[in-house]
Amino acid sequence: MVGRVQGKVAFVTGAARGQGRSHALRLAEEGADIIAVDICKDIETIGYPMAKPEDLDETATLVEKTGRGIVTAQADVREAAQLKEALERGIAEFGKVDIVVAQAGIAGMKGQP
């Protein structure tokens, strides 16, 4: 399927699974190349497991099946330098960024409420 974002490049955080993966895949199906970012490791203060590197790899595989390009990066959205590096890698590959989907997000619910 090719659609209204044909030839665009999307930078998607939280892309390893869940809504982030869903956005990345839909944008790819509609013609966008993807720069996919996720932390891919657990955070001590969060009481549930975060995405794993394998989850981000699966997102890449699914995007590639659409025929679109993807650059992945394990990066913590709380660290500007990590995001900058991921963005620069994506721009080096695709030349630009047209769309940003800031989907990374967690709920800090460790222990009893």
Regions found by a protein language model. Give the residues of each.
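Active-site loop/turn elements of alpha/beta-hydrolase fold enzymes
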Residues: I39, V77, I106
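Conserved amphipathic alpha-helix within the SDR
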Residues: A60-E64, I70-K96
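Structural signature of beta-strand start/N-cap positions in the alpha/beta core
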Residues: V9, D33, G69-V71, K96-D98
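Rossmann-fold scaffold of SDR-type NAD(P)-dependent oxidoreductases
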Residues: T13, Q74, V97-G105
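Glycine/Thr-rich phosphate-binding loops of Rossmann-like dinucleotide-binding domains
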Residues: G20, E44-T45, K110-G111
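Glycine-rich phosphate-binding loop and adjoining beta1-alpha1-beta2 segment
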Residues: D38-L62
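Canonical Rossmann dinucleotide-binding motif of NAD(H)/NADP(H)-dependent dehydrogenases/reductases
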Residues: V2-D42
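Conserved mid-core segment of classical short-chain dehydrogenase/reductases
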Residues: M50-D57, K84, A107-P113
